[in-house]
Amino acid sequence: MLVLFETSGGFALFKVLDEGKLSNVEDLGTEFYSAESARRMGLHKFLKNNCDDGEILAVADPKLGDIITEKLDIECVHNDAVMELLRGVRSQLTELLSGLDDNDLAPVSLELSHILARYKLKITSDKVETMIILSISLLDDLDKELNTYTTSVCELYGLHFPELANIVQDNILYAKVVKLMGNRINAATLDFSEILADEVEAELKEASMVSTRTEVSDLDLMHIQELCDQVLSIAEDKTLLCDDLKNKMNKIAPNLTALVGELVGARLISHCGSLWNLSKLPWSTIQILGAEKTLYKALKTKQATPKYGLIYHAPLVRQAAPENKGKIARSLAAKSALAIRCDAFGNGQDNTMGVESRLKLEARLRNLEGGDLGACEEEEEVNDKDTKKEADDEEEPKTEECSKKRKKEAELETVEDPAKKSKQEGVTGLLLLMLLISLIYFFSVNQLLW
Amino acid sequence: MTVEGVNPKAYPLADSQLSITILDLVQQATNYKQLKKGANEATKTLNRGISEFIVMAADTEPLEILLHLPLLAEDKVFEFLLIVSLSYESQLVVSLALASFTGFTWVSSSYDKKIRLYWLLDSSFEIVIVDNVPYVFVPSKQALGRACDVTRPVIACSVTSNEASQLKSQIQHLKDAIEKLLI
């Protein structure tokens, strides 16, 4: 009988000398002398080379035994005696296998346990959203810093050459022009063709000769140009960060990126903390993520709830007409929820679902905005359905928040009951008064007759 | 029904007999207004804690669009603080405290649920009752749509709780049957 033993470093095959007692196990010379040969050899070839016909193989896992029997025609056995035998082998493993000791076995076991745990939890180490969350925060910070610096450049250089702000509108081009030109007197002799168009360049040179503002000193000019270097450097960093974010989003959430773009997708993931948390939300929550303050204010004052949050900046919502933004935002949120779940739970890098959903939404957008006269009735029906759906969606959040208000209303109803009772008493009094007047009138008439 | 083409991620998958029972109960829940249709509304019922069990269709394409429901169903935890008083609760608290120190999960016959005791830093404690919502896959979304009285296929639905409902015993039996699939 042979015994197949599984270790974290590979497989081992032992021969049982005395099957009756199941003792005196002996090494068959199947040590793995080098890691290279061990790594290349698979279980199939290993068993085929070492098992003779008619041998019985003892295995620890009955399912593995069934597979071995099916593919290699080796009879396998699995029972309590085999388990006891394997336990004994495990306790003496370092002695039975020459060239192997506990210090070598520990890191291999640790690596195997990590791989097994990662497989069980279905965590892929390259799908980590922390970089995305930090990248989108850094992108926002760079935006603010860039705005501050460009405003400073315009203010400082405006003292010297105020017409330039009207001629060159773009901040980055403005910084490049200032850096190249320096003093405005130099504008007449310099060549701006690499930065500006011909008409703008001619206009710039004309304005530089007729400007009547103060002169700028060399020290101030040096400071302004250093500030321009800062602006251009930050703009370059921002461009690199955008490209990097695009690559990461296409890797982690390809369907969501195809639908709403990498910036909006990154903001959604950043808002929820991870793609895993984002996948657990219903699409009505995804539609108004980023507008929580407005939502709670609307619920408290019983006004209209918001139609979009972060999703407003998606390209599909931005290119829609104002009256259609709400409908497109709702459809986009529904498709985005499905795309997010595909990204979170699917293992592939396939973005087919996102691309198809985007095509459907674009077709719907064209259908909404390009209204034919013949389709007016259909549009009206669609609008009615959408209005009803919106009402249904708005009702559900209110029910959650209005439970306290309902209690207050119940208290108010109990307070109103005495008012009703007092009204009823008033009515009864009035009837009694009318009856009394009738009686008095009757007696008066009788007295006149008498 | 072709069993070979079923996605292996659709687990636990009901066999034909249990599927008929599930769809029949789903239809009755529709009549009693105890059903929420669609993956979105099922998500909301799980978040609000009013779901008895979740039924999902195994032939959804792609199946990932409803794999968040098992996560939410297994993640449902009800927490509350227990106030110490000289009564039956006091004895229960002492027992729970002993169980907490030994590190075991206490299963109390009174509550019939798994209870864990967390000793907080301010000498009070928090009791967590872990109550998973059962979920099950049925082979066909068309059949699930018909059971929900909807002309279109339905990929997920949730039977909600109602203490006064006549379906209470049937729901309990079906929940037990669903949990047997996981053994």
UniProtKB/Swiss-Prot annotation, chain A:
<dbReference type="GO" id="GO:0030515">
    <property type="term" value="F:snoRNA binding"/>
</dbReference>
<dbReference type="InterPro" id="IPR002687">
    <property type="entry name" value="Nop_dom"/>
</dbReference>
<feature type="domain" description="Nop">
    <location>
        <begin position="252"/>
        <end position="370"/>
    </location>
</feature>
<keyword id="KW-0690">Ribosome biogenesis</keyword>
<dbReference type="InterPro" id="IPR042239">
    <property type="entry name" value="Nop_C"/>
</dbReference>
<feature type="compositionally biased region" description="Basic and acidic residues">
    <location>
        <begin position="399"/>
        <end position="423"/>
    </location>
</feature>
<dbReference type="GO" id="GO:0042254">
    <property type="term" value="P:ribosome biogenesis"/>
</dbReference>
<dbReference type="GO" id="GO:0032040">
    <property type="term" value="C:small-subunit processome"/>
</dbReference>
<dbReference type="InterPro" id="IPR012976">
    <property type="entry name" value="NOSIC"/>
</dbReference>
<dbReference type="GO" id="GO:0005730">
    <property type="term" value="C:nucleolus"/>
</dbReference>
<protein>
    <recommendedName>
        <fullName>Putative nucleolar protein 5-3</fullName>
    </recommendedName>
</protein>
<dbReference type="Pfam" id="PF01798">
    <property type="entry name" value="Nop"/>
</dbReference>
<dbReference type="InterPro" id="IPR036070">
    <property type="entry name" value="Nop_dom_sf"/>
</dbReference>
<keyword id="KW-0539">Nucleus</keyword>
<feature type="region of interest" description="Disordered">
    <location>
        <begin position="375"/>
        <end position="423"/>
    </location>
</feature>
<dbReference type="InterPro" id="IPR045056">
    <property type="entry name" value="Nop56/Nop58"/>
</dbReference>
<comment type="similarity">
    <text>Belongs to the NOP5/NOP56 family.</text>
</comment>
<comment type="function">
    <text>Required for 60S ribosomal subunit biogenesis.</text>
</comment>
<dbReference type="GO" id="GO:0031428">
    <property type="term" value="C:box C/D methylation guide snoRNP complex"/>
</dbReference>
